[in-house]
């Protein structure tokens, strides 16, 4: 079934209540944890007896042993009328809120969009082949839309500059949405919508490739370039739509948008209490970034989630939806408006030797979502947000299931918020992720350090599950942030009374209460289990206040019961079965409390060194917590 039809069917048939977890009473929880020592011992025996989990990683890699094949015919864009452009120097943002000089196509440059589209159409019509973008500067006022059996290749020295004009990404889509433009089916932070086209786009295609000769083959999203004359909506460039550094009422994704009507106007007959629980207090629900998840939570079908003109949801740079047999290789991406790569519901996707260089807001490097069979190999990341963030939907948009069978290897993370991140949009679940031979280089450690190397982030709204995450052989030559960014619990929360470096400062972070105040519907307790991390090697840096590698070695913040606001009776499951072995975390700044645990059981440290001290022990800190008659109850901690 095509992607759009599947989404419609899903959203019409799944009620919100179907995503609720079955609740357990206090007695059930207590019985489940009566013999924590025995459970830990049994788990240790099971680990010894089971097969090597890394065999599955080898099987995933083997899926890519046979290269994709294409017809041996080239379709050069100059044969279809493309002409190169010249560049001029202008003022713009070189990174988020940092002004500098940028190269951009001169005003009046010839547009190569029609030629690229014609070359792809001709190639596809003949059964496939290779579309070649030669060396030179190319101005492209519209998206490159990939089609089955077509390989788009950038020659060495080919640089494609996508126009800094949102109108060009709202005039070629297959969904005519009137004043909002001709839009495409997209997914924005885990929720489906009709929106501006990404700069490179494909939907329901098979056997496709986007490649470059080397890292002089560049796709430039011009996220910090001022918008072209004639586009007057909102601030000055794509990155400004984030709302950072702008006057309070400037129209951005975080300012209430009058084009977003109340839910009872979109969903006639919606229960008033349900509407209130989704929208929350004030007008935050009316901002574009919150209105889309509200539409999902209310069960609004995708065809009625119309954004584009009049709204401020930035498109991804490269988004592939419902595709299989995909190769992304050998090019560089610069200055993306939003996430750099976003495959959704794709199968058998290989990204190899790609340089991801973008320091704008939300500049995640590679975000696979609801995908099965992904290999990330030999890539370089320097990003304004997470380098890699594995996702699987948000609210009710979980119909494509989990992301599973992902291998990440031989990569370098120069900078970013998180190195390898899972979430936060993970409502559909994540399982069987393998990461090895990684260098979290953290080159900007003096002034803009990596927040955390290995990170999971979810909460009672995102929910979902993470199971079977395996990480080994990673180095951190400059550690991570040594100044913490602390957890912000909901007002009145009582469980955690000490500072927790859940946002920045830990080398390993499992955060199951990520920014809980961002969501009004907190009804889906997440489940996190079966994680193994080994051979982590961390080096201290001279901070001027001492030689440190991090603030804390690891933070395991399990689900926080008081953040839940769903139906009474729901169990709040702990993080379970985490093993960290054969690792040296250097010297944390917080030597008094080198780690933090909350609601976590069977956490094994096996030959782990922190601040020169070796640890060989199993940790548990379980709040036996549940919800009774709408009130949070904390029985006691099992330490």
Describe these PLM feature segments:
Residues 156-157, 206-217, 324-334, 347-358, ...:
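Right-handed parallel beta-helix
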Residues 219-240, 349, 353, 550-569:
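C-terminal/domain-terminus segments
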Residues 128, 141-142, 163-165, 222-225, ...:
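Short glycine/acidic-rich loop motifs that flank beta-strands on beta-rich extracellular proteins
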Residues 445-639:
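Extracellular beta-rich repeat passengers
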Residues 120-122, 140-147, 339-345, 378, ...:
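Short, T/G/N/S-enriched strand-turn elements that build extracellular solenoid repeat scaffolds
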Residues 79, 85, 93, 110-113, ...:
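Asp-box/BNR beta-propeller blade signature and adjacent active/binding-site loops
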Residues 314, 322, 345, 362, ...:
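Exposed loop/turn and edge beta-strand positions of beta-sandwich/beta-sheet ligand-binding modules
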Residues 2, 9-151, 155-322, 329, ...:
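Extracellular "leader-to-stem" segments immediately downstream of a signal peptide or signal-anchor
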């Amino acid at each position: 079934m095509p992607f759009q039809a599947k989404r419609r069917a899903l959203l019409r048939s799944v009620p919100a209540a179907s995503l609720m977890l079955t609740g357990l009473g206090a007695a059930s929880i207590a019985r489940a944890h009566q013999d924590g020592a025995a459970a830990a011992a049994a788990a240790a025996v099971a680990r010894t007896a089971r097969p090597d989990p890394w065999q599955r990683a080898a099987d995933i890699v083997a899926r890519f042993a046979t290269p994709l094949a294409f017809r041996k015919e080239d379709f050069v864009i100059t044969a279809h009328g493309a002409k190169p452009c010249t560049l001029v120097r202008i003022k713009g943002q070189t990174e988020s809120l940092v002004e500098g000089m940028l190269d951009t196509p001169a005003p009046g440059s010839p547009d190569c969009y029609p030629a690229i589209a014609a070359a792809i159409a001709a190639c596809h019509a003949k059964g496939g082949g290779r579309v070649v973008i030669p060396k030179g500067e190319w101005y492209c006022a519209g998206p490159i839309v990939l089609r089955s059996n077509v390989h788009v290749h950038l020659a060495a020295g080919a640089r494609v500059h996508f126009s800094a004009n949102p109108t060009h990404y709202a005039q070629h889509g297959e969904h005519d949405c009137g004043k909002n433009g001709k839009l495409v089916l997209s997914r924005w932070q885990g929720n489906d919508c009709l929106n501006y086209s990404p700069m490179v786009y494909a939907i329901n295609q098979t056997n496709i490739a986007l490649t470059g000769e080397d890292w002089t083959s560049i796709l430039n999203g011009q996220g910090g370039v001022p918008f072209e004359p004639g586009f007057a909506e909102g601030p000055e460039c794509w990155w400004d739509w984030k709302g950072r550094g702008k006057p309070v009422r400037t129209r951005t994704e975080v300012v209430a948008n009058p084009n977003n009507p109340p839910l009872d106007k979109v969903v006639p007959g919606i229960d008033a209490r349900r509407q209130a629980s989704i929208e929350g207090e004030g007008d935050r629900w009316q901002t574009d970034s919150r209105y889309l998840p509200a539409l999902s939570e209310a069960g609004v079908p995708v065809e009625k989630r119309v954004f584009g003109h009049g709204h401020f949801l930035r498109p991804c740079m490269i988004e592939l939806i419902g595709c299989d047999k995909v190769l992304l290789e050998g090019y560089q991406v610069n200055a993306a408006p939003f996430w750099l790569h976003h495959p959704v519901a794709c199968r058998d996707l290989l990204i190899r030797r790609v340089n991801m260089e973008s320091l704008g807001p939300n500049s995640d490097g590679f975000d696979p979502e609801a995908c099965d069979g992904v290999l990330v190999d030999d890539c370089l990341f320097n990003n304004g947000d997470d380098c890699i963030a594995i996702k699987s939907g948000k609210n009710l948009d979980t119909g494509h299931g989990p992301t599973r069978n992902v291998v990440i290897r031989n990569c370098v993370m120069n900078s970013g918020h998180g190195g390898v991140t899972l979430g936060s949009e993970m409502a559909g679940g994540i399982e069987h992720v393998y990461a090895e031979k990684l260098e979290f280089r953290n080159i900007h450690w003096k002034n803009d350090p990596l927040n955390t190397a290995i990170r999971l982030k979810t909460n009672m709204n995102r929910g979902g599950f993470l199971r079977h995450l395996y990480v080994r052989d990673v180095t951190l030559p400059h550690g991570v942030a040594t100044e913490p960014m602390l957890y912000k619990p909901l007002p009145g929360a009582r469980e955690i009374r000490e500072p927790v470096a859940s946002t920045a400062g830990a080398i390993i972070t499992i955060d199951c209460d990520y920014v809980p105040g961002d969501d009004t519907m907190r009804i889906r307790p997440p489940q996190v289990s079966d994680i193994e991390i080994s051979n982590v090697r961390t080096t201290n840096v001279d901070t001027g206040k001492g030689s440190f590698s991090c603030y804390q070695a690891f933070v395991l913040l399990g689900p926080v019961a008081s953040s839940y606001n769903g139906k009474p009776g729901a169990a709040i499951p702990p993080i379970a079965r985490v093993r960290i072995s054969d690792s040296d975390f250097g010297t944390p700044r917080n030597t008094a409390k080198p780690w933090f645990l909350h609601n976590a059981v069977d956490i094994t440290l096996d030959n782990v060194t922190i601040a020169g001290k070796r640890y060989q022990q199993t940790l548990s800190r379980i709040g036996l917590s549940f919800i009774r008659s709408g009130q949070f109850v904390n029985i006691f901690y099992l330490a």
